[in-house]
Amino acid sequence: MTNYPYKTREGGATVTVFVPYDCGNHCPFCINKQEYENPVGFSLEKICESIRTMDEITPKCDFVFTGGEPFADLDALQTMLDQIPTTHRVFINTTLPTLQGATEDDLVAFTEKNKDKITCINCSRHVVKYVAECSDDIFSRIAVPVRVNCVLYKDYPKENLKPYLDRFKPYGVSVQFRFDYTDTTPENLYEEESDKILHDLKDLFHYTGMDGCRM
């Protein structure tokens, strides 16, 4: 992995924005769920105020919207995006779920409206499904770049990894596999010898470097 050194963002810190509404999902590896159990003081107005403050401090930082599910409230997400000048890069972490009160056409229209502001959408699509997802066809319609993120959780089926990648070939999106953050420790973070995921990926695929949505 030394041939592909990790690179940090030039221009300031990365600001992570936890949207002030829950996703309604229960993914077993989610590290944010407990943040939504006590939403006291967690409001759209305060988040917008914080966004403006960070813009004053570091006018070229990256903003990453996560949650929760940012697309669960398109009006609120639009309000937050409207606070961010175009000097910043903006990333959105999402499952692109099926939503009450919003259609796939609504999601596509939202990306079209904000295509000059949204740098990339990081969409979770897992080998084992945990949420009700909208169709993969939306990847060919979204007006901004998309990267698919896949958490390889516990005893994932290795034999499904290649069919999983083949699933996204028609859409030309990048796919990132990652470890379960809830199981990550300082001791195992850089450990390669007993890393099952790393060995499975090396066995099935050829790593050529990082591309796609990089924060």
Q: Which sequence ranges carry the predicted segments?
A:
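Radical SAM enzyme [4Fe-4S]-AdoMet core and its adjacent flexible, acidic
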Residues: 40, 125-215
